Every structure is written in C-alpha cells, then in structure tokens.
Amino acid sequence: MPQSNHYSHQSRSHNDRRRQQPDEKVQATVNIGQRFPLTIRRLGINGEGIGYYKHVITFVKGALPEEVVVAEVTAVHPRYLEAKIRSIRKPSPDRVDPRDAYAGEVGGFELEHLDYPAQLAFKQDLIRQALEKYRPAGYRHYDVRPTIGMTNPYEYRNKAQFQVRLIDGHVAAGLYKENSHDLVDLPTCSVQMPATMTVMRQVVAWLEELQVPIYDEEHNSGIVKTIVVREAAATGEIQLVFITNTPKLPKKHQLLMKIAEKLPMVVSVMQNINAGKTSLIWGDQTTLLAGKPTITEELDGLVFDLSARAFFQLNPQQTKKLYRLAREALNLAPNETLVDAYSGVGTIGLSLADVAKEVRGMDTIPAAVADANANAQRNQITNAHYEVGEAEVLLPQWLASGFAPDAMVVDPPRTGLDNVLIDAILQSAPEKLVYISCNPSTLAQDLQALTRGYQVDYIQSIDMFPQTARCEAVVRFTKRH
C-alpha cells in the first residue's frame, strides 16, 4: 500500500493552521460527556487522532486521519479537549483490526490499528512535525528519509517486564491500564518474542499452582511483584528474574525444579529484592537462584554477556540495522578516533572499533561502564576504553590531555543532549558527528544549537518499536568550515 500523504504535515491547509487558535467561548460551553461529529486531520506525537471542534484542537485516542468519528469529550483543558470514540462514521482505509484485544487499554500498542506502511509514514512525519515546530537552521531543506521498517513488525521485543497481581483469585501478569494501577492480564502479546511469553505464562501458572504469595499493592503484602523474561536472540538463552517484596521466596526450590525440567532454555534465574511501595521496578540487590548470572547475546560478530540490569536494545533485528546506519554515516578511516557519548554497555562504540584507531566512551552509570569494558575484553578489543563520568566534563579533560576526537556518536536518552555537552561538542568540533535519537522533539531542539557548528546531511528514521508511536532516527552532520 502506498504511504498516504495525509500522514504528512505538508498536506495541512492554511485553514487547518487557523483552526489551532482556540475559541474560548466555545471551550467554556463544552462539557465532559458531550458528543459531536469530528473529522480527524492528522496524528499527534503520541499516535492520537487530532481534529478541531469549532477551532478547538481535540485529541481522540484511537482515531485515524481522514476518519469521521462521533467523539465524546473526556477532559476539557484551557487550550484543548480530550475525547474518545463513540462510533466511527467513516473509517480510514488504513484502519486494520489489532491482533491484541487489549491494544487500546495498555501502553505500547497505540498504533496497532494502523496499517504498517501508514505507521512508517507517520514516523517520518513525526520528525517533520518536530522540525516545523522548533525550526533549526535550514530545516526546510533537510533530507528526511523514509522510515526503515521490519518485514514482520511483530514478535520483536526480547524482554517482557510484567507486573504480577491477583485478579479474582488468579495470578495475573501483564501491564497497567494507561494512567492507572489497574492490571491487564496478558496471556498473549503479539510484539514479544514468542519464547518470552512461553516462559512468562508457564511461570505464572506455576506461581498459582504452588500458591506462592503474590504482592498486594494496597496492603503492601505478599511477595512476587514483577516477572522479567529476557531472551538473547542469537543464542536462544533466556534469563528469568523474580522481583520480590522480601528476600524470602516461598516454594523457591519447587519452582526451580519445574523450571529446570520444563524450560531448558532458561539458563539464568535471578531474584531482585525491591521492598515496599515504590514506583521503581528494580531494587538494588540482585542474587543468583540457578544457572549463570548472565545470558549471552551476539550482535554483528560481537558477544555480550547481559546481566539482569544491563541495558540492551529491545529489538535485536532493528538494532543491527541501526548500528549499520551509524557505521555508514560515520564512514570512519583507520586513523580516526571516535568518542562514544552515552555509551551504555558499549554496544555502539565496540561495533565501530574495528574501523577506528581508538574508541573512547563515557557513561554516568558505573555498572554500565564496567560492563562496557568487560565487553571490550570479552571480544578482545584493545582499542576501546570506557570511563565513568559526564561527557561535558570528560571531553574537555581529554582535549586538554591532547586527545582530539575525529568523530563522535551520541545516543542520548529521550530528554536529549545536555546543553553543556552541546557546548563541549561545538568546542571540540569533531569533523564527523552522528546523533542517534529516540525522541524527535528533543532532537529538533538540539539541532537548533548544533547547527551553529554543523550542517545536517540527512535524517534517517528507523522503526525500532512497531505498533507504537515511538520513533528513532540517525542524523549525520558535516562540520561547517
């Protein structure tokens, strides 16, 4: 199916822009529960449909561009309305039936009702929308390339992290409804790698059979809070983590016997203790219950030992494409040095070490840096070294000691680059710069500053999370002279 142009902001009319001016009189008379027909113009950054009711921007979860829906107001805000679909009078040609019955209830499935080619078009447009909003230098001329998708946009997630609770006397494992602590049990999940769900559901059945105490959030009682299952795609090894309210895990030995007998792919069983009521999933203490403390993953010829807390990209198939895009964009020569900022466990920098003279990386999390250096050693890479610290502190120190990087790759969190780091990048002025972004909005904001010293060659979006509204991109820069 061709990518529909109604997923592009460029197809919006001037009238459409005028509709963004709120009509305060109308807004004052809108009530929760009020219904009205609404034509959906485009998708917002969270995948929600956007229409205009008497000039007031209205966000309708689950609605798609070109649809005519009957919307019911769920919230009235000073500058916008929120609504839900009561009925669809005219469906989008891109609307499909989601595979997961709970897709509209929990996060992570916000685009599952949208045909996949249209999802890819939307993600390319997300970048254009962000550029239009923040207007970095020359943005109208940027080469924003079509999103690289997946042949099969399902069964890609290598980790399932499900909350565990009792529902009607039965053990349930799944995700919370959006903006609540109401758990939705997930017996199946189309975006998870199948083996992760096989292990998850079998363990849930055993917890019920053995009557292991399940955590009760309201009374802060019970024991098992969360189950985490991670699969190493290259080796098939699986790690299972029980996150518990206490160090004690009743029926532990019976559980471990069943796992060893029935789930041979589980080679690592861990327990993480996270006591009391807290919004954090993980506690500080992790112990080995059975097997080995890590699982072994491979990526483009490199081997990584993943501990329970170690970060690794959730989509192994697309990660290979992502890192090849970074390699292609940097186009390193054998005599060039590379800085890997926000290095995590070193996956990006180590994947480039074979084409660089030297790789230096940094991260603020000591455990990640320890993993990065261990991964370098594990792969017999001698020209890569990682340090604990902030890039904006370490970069000037390295420059002062005579290390001037020829190239830099940055892979920041969703909050984007720190302003001090941007200044450090502009001061150190590496000839080559590649930015791996997981948030178009903060990318566009960072481009406002980075374009003082660099020009944008292209922005290549890549779909790391099909069926969601999340968008990643690789940006290549050339230094201004």
Curated annotation (Swiss-Prot):
It is an enzyme of class 2 (transferase). Keywords: Methyltransferase, S-adenosyl-L-methionine, Transferase. Gene3D superfamilies: 2.40.50.1070, Nucleic acid-binding proteins, Vaccinia Virus protein VP39. Residues 1-28 are annotated as: Disordered. InterPro entries: MeTrfase_TrmA_AS, NA-bd_OB-fold, SAM-dependent_MTases_sf, TRAM_dom, U5_MeTrfase_fam. Residues 29-87 form the TRAM domain. It comes from the Bacteria. GO terms for molecular function: rRNA (uridine-C5-)-methyltransferase activity. S-adenosyl-L-methionine binds at Q313, Y342, D363, D411. Its EC number is 2.1.1.-. The active site is at C438. GO terms for biological process: rRNA base methylation. Pfam families: TRAM, tRNA_U5-meth_tr. Belongs to the class I-like SAM-binding methyltransferase superfamily. RNA M5U methyltransferase family. This is Uncharacterized RNA methyltransferase lp_3226.
